[in-house]
UniProtKB/Swiss-Prot annotation:
Protein name (database record): MFS-type transporter sphD
Any one of the GO CC terms: plasma membrane
Residues carrying covalently attached carbohydrate according to the record: 335
Knockout consequences: Does not affect the production of sphingofungins.
Biased composition (Basic and acidic residues): 51-62
Top-rank taxon, per record: Eukaryota
Record function comment: MFS-type transporter; part of the gene cluster that mediates the biosynthesis of sphingofungins, bioactive molecules acting as sphingolipid inhibitors via inhibiting serine palmitoyl transferase (SPT).
Alphabetized GO MF terms: transmembrane transporter activity
InterPro entries: MFS (IPR011701), MFS_dom (IPR020846), MFS_trans_sf (IPR036259)
Origin species: Aspergillus fumigatus (strain CBS 144.89 / FGSC A1163 / CEA10)
Location relative to the cell: Membrane
Chain intervals for the UniProt region annotation (Disordered): 17-62
Similarity comment text for this entry: Belongs to the major facilitator superfamily.
Amino acid sequence: MGQAEFNARTDASAEISAFAVRAEPDSEPVSEKQGTAETDAETGAGGTEVPAERNGEDDVERTPKKSLSFKLAFIGLAASMFVFQVDATALGIALPTIAADLKGESLESFWANLSYTLCGLVMQPVWASISTAFGRKPPLYVSMALFFIGSIVFAVAQNMNTIIVGRVLQGFGGGGIDVLAEVILADMTTLEERSKYLGLMAIPMAIGNIMGPSVGALFATYASWRWIGWVNLPLLGIGTPLVFFFLKLRPVPLDASLAKNLNRLDWIGMVLVVVGITIFVLPLSWAGSLFPWGAWQTLVPLFLGVAVLVIFAFYEARPDAPIVPHRLFHSKTGNMTLVGGFLHGAVLVSLLQYLPLIYQAVQLETAILSAVSLLPTVIISVVVAAISMMLVPWFGGYVWILRLAWVILTLGTGLLALFDVGSSSSMRLGLPILWGAGVALLRLNLLPMQASVKNVDDTGLAIGQFLTIRMFGGLVGLTISATIFNSVFSTSISATAVHLTGPLAPLKDVANAVAFIDKLRSIDVPVETRDQVLRVYLKCFQTIFYTMTGLSGLGLVTSLFVDEIDLKSQGLGNQRFEE
């Protein structure tokens, strides 16, 4: 959909994730409790044995009460995630203003938007692998530094090429912040207490994710788009010192030789996964906008990307420390969780993109007012996140809450199709609330089902794998939604009696449909004509909602195949928090 569709290709990694993983010598899925009971010593990443009391009764005594250092470190991680979530969703709405100011072309705008998402996507499994080999903190510090530098480069840019460079650096850093904060949270908490800290972290993440478009619109309209970059610096300045001074994790034993340490990494696997994902994602991003779906520019890289990823999958059976170990797929619960994560990403990211647009296109609200209309949904999401912290102990597990979350999300997504031209204020404000509640409940209870991934050394790899699949699901969901929008709009506008002349002439090209939304409030056409155009837009959004309802229902089906996990284990990750 041209320039406007480029804006739709935004990152929206707005979920909370943590995996529960334990060390076991065999390959059968077991609970954390079993894993702790059956081992008298825990083997660290470097092969060093840790006495049993450090992993058994001692943990039971220490974990219920958290120290001040733990709490401050957690606040630092949550603050860093808030910055990442705001930045991830702020650019899309401001990109037309940036392109106009810097005289950027459509292709440059495309890369400015895609580079952030793509770099964050491909680097998540890489950062996770590095953190497993060298410890969590060094790559986290590097990620924060890259994000900080990228924000400055973006803020001072004088041309679109510099904007792209800044977004690439921010993508590298943001992807690391996202995955490593999740991994560290899993290391720091037991399975029983994890829902509490997931709920606490969900609050700044949900607020940041929804605030992003409003921040972008406010700066682009009333100040300068450069503040989208500058505002990251003081916000990151809150979280970084807290993490640096108070995050005390058990170090990973390293060899004296740098070469031996570097040999721990699966270099070939990293190259294959980065190249494969990049080649595969690019045609998904430009299909229907830069090139048609049937063009060789779309099909050739798509098939090449699949081929490289297949090679990567087979190759990962060879390294001693693969980036994606095959043992991660030995659990039915883990596999169903991955499928659920993909579907969750598709539904969430698509609706985060198109919900504000239905307010602007059908209800004729400005970008800022559309964000205000979604505030009740944000508030409910935060409340549900807080309540969910208590639900897991009450239910005695995650499975039934997970299924309830999918039911609520399916119903809430279906209700969005009730939007209509001239809907009442109560309808406009209330329809997305159930969807928001389902999203909040699901994001907190989906990922802990990865308890069947049992090797404690695989914590980072498993989370990196999940976040990559979830983000990839979001990109696929956006592609599906954009294709639906194009197809339905083209068919529906042709079926109306509206003459696409004068101020409506741009709508002859479906690529202009989203960009034209801003003009709907002021076009000089008869009321009946505008009403017909608005109903064409409405039909596009309703079809997207119907499709996402189906995907949500499929997610509910996946939850029927997951097994309950034991909440009584007090086991922590190898790189656990230490006083």
